[in-house]
UniProtKB/Swiss-Prot annotation:
Pathway: Glycolipid biosynthesis; 4-amino-4-deoxy-alpha-L-arabinose undecaprenyl phosphate biosynthesis; 4-amino-4-deoxy-alpha-L-arabinose undecaprenyl phosphate from UDP-4-deoxy-4-formamido-beta-L-arabinose and undecaprenyl phosphate: step 2/2; Bacterial outer membrane biogenesis; lipopolysaccharide biosynthesis. Its EC number is 3.5.1.n3. It comes from Salmonella gallinarum (strain 287/91 / NCTC 13346). This is Probable 4-deoxy-4-formamido-L-arabinose-phosphoundecaprenol deformylase ArnD. SUPFAM superfamilies: Glycoside hydrolase/deacetylase (SSF88713). The keyword Lipid biosynthesis applies.
Length: 299
């Protein structure tokens, strides 16, 4: 049996309002639990449209047919009008999710984090994280114990900024296996659970067709030599491609794959995890930099 961590990122108002309820129903039907990471502040995702002047981002949008994939309400959110507060508008849905699934913070403002966190000070990072955690805890009525950086925009500064919040784990980068981030010689931070597998929007296009994606990603899960972690998005697999996602759950189970919340991947003694660090890097299919796992030594 292959155990795969299932991470669900919720970036937008529509993803929360429409995608999450469908995903909850899908997961219930298939007897699967996952980790949901919510954006709880303003939905300003439409402000990413200026990135269309960048060739790699434009190609990604064309390759994934973004207008039909996400919908124009997502692509234009927060452009001509102030972005609506996601958490306030969908508190009931978020609370219901937290009743049945592991629930953590994705971001206060997904667009702001993805655009500006790379040059924020440690203090600015801490303030933004605190704002998101405070809002999410007020909604779910219990402590937030995990987080996942929006767009995998994370480096050593982000690791340090999250330390005061005493989280059980973070999922801030791409990599191969769980690790303890090295803060300084002799001091390690909160365990990291990297995403190891590509997302739909990173690979769909000429190389992998939509109708063959499930076969392709299941093969990648079974071949993963580390600790497999797969990310879906409420805006994609919860709306337009919900039937394909449910088919993936069925076919994965038949292939001997069991999905689980990321927290279940943690060992009893996190001290046994290898050391590592998060550095800025690039991966195929994703525009811009993101956090990538790198080995580190204790010396």
């Amino acid at each position: 049996m292959t155990k795969v961590g299932l991470r669900i990122d919720v970036d937008t108002l529509r993803g929360t309002r429409e995608g999450v309820p469908r995903l909850l129903a899908t997961l219930h039907r298939q007897g699967v639990q996952a980790s949901f990471f919510f954006s709880v502040g303003p939905d300003n995702m439409g402000r990413h449209l200026w990135r269309l002047i960048r060739p790699r981002f434009l190609w990604k949008m064309l390759r994934s047919n973004a207008a039909s994939l996400y919908g124009w309400d997502i692509l234009l959110a927060g452009t001509a009008w102030p972005g609506k507060n996601i958490g306030n508008a969908n508190a009931g849905i978020i609370r219901e999710t937290a009743t049945y699934h592991e629930t953590g913070l994705h971001a206060w403002d997904h667009h702001a984090w993805q655009t500006h966190s790379g040059h924020w000070s440690i203090r600015q990072l801490e303030e933004d994280i605190a704002r998101g955690i405070t809002a999410l805890e007020a909604i779910i009525g219990k402590p937030v114990t995990c987080s996942a950086a929006a767009g995998w925009r994370a480096d050593g500064r982000v690791v340090r900024a999250k330390e005061p919040f005493n989280l059980r784990y973070n999922s801030d980068c791409r990599g191969t296996t769980l690790f303890r981030p090295l803060l300084m010689p002799g001091q390690t931070g909160t365990p990291q659970i990297p995403v190891t597998l590509p997302t739909w929007d990173e690979v769909i296009g000429p190389a992998v067709q939509a109708q063959s994606f499930n076969t392709w990603i299941i093969s990648r899960m079974l071949q993963d030599k580390g600790t497999p972690v797969y990310t879906i998005h409420a805006e994609v697999e919860g709306i337009v491609h919900q039937p394909l996602f449910e088919d993936l759950l069925v076919r994965a189970r038949d292939a001997g794959i069991t999905f689980c919340p990321l927290g279940e991947l943690l060992p009893t003694s996190p001290e046994s995890l290898p050391l590592g660090q998060i550095v800025r890097g690039h991966i195929p299919g994703r525009e811009g930099w993101l956090g990538c796992q790198q080995a580190a030594s204790a010396s």
